[in-house]
Amino acid sequence: MTNFNESVWVTTAVKKEQFPESDAIEIVLSGRSNVGKSSCINAICEKKAMAYVGKRPGKTRYLNFFKVNDQLWLVDVPGYGFAQRSQTELKSYGILMEDYFNTRKQCKACLLVIDSRHGLTADDQDMLDYILEKNYPYRIVATKCDKLTYSKKLAIKKELEGLYGADCVILFSALSKEGRVDLQKWCASQIDETR
């Protein structure tokens, strides 16, 4: 049994030389800016403020590594689609992401975090295409689902599963904790499935 509440922040990396040494598998949380990736990490790990949650989009600008245990780490990556970044920042973000995905053999699975109220955006679709191209196991995490009616929750789940297959979506709310156990189970299952 994986004890997520024993998770700890390990380090922040600005460039690939700062990626930490580890034999654990890594699950990346990717998504647009301000979609709830940090809140998702905090909920998975049963901590209130392990990952910084910013009020403004674009606060996570580097890779943040979180150790769940010796076999599993979570990686919070900068959000995409935030227009108020300079060209220099966008270029360094692109290099950092390429370095991570192309050189980090520990990266074994992805959680694509989307805002359930907006569905899959064009940027999300691009990221999902990349995940599929890399052949990573994945789940689409539809956050902020506490703001949707029951019928709208069912509709987004049905729509995405119709496109990408059964069980590809986890409805999630950091507020109500809906979906947290499903996320924890899926993350823990990747330890054996991706080794």
Residue ranges and their predicted role:
Residues 4-16, 147-195:
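Canonical P-loop GTPase G-domain recognition
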Residues 1-84:
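Conserved G1/Walker A P-loop phosphate-binding module
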Residues 66, 143, 183:
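Residue-level signal for inorganic ion chemistry
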Residues 69-107:
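Conserved nucleotide-sensing/catalytic segment adjacent to the nucleotide-binding pocket
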Residues 49, 62, 73, 89-93, ...:
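Helical mechanochemical/support elements of P-loop NTPase systems and associated helical scaffolds
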Residues 59, 72, 79-82, 117-119, ...:
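Conserved nucleotide-binding/hydrolysis micro-motifs of P-loop NTPases
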Residues 98-167:
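Conserved C-terminal guanine-recognition region of P-loop GTPase G domains, centered on the G4
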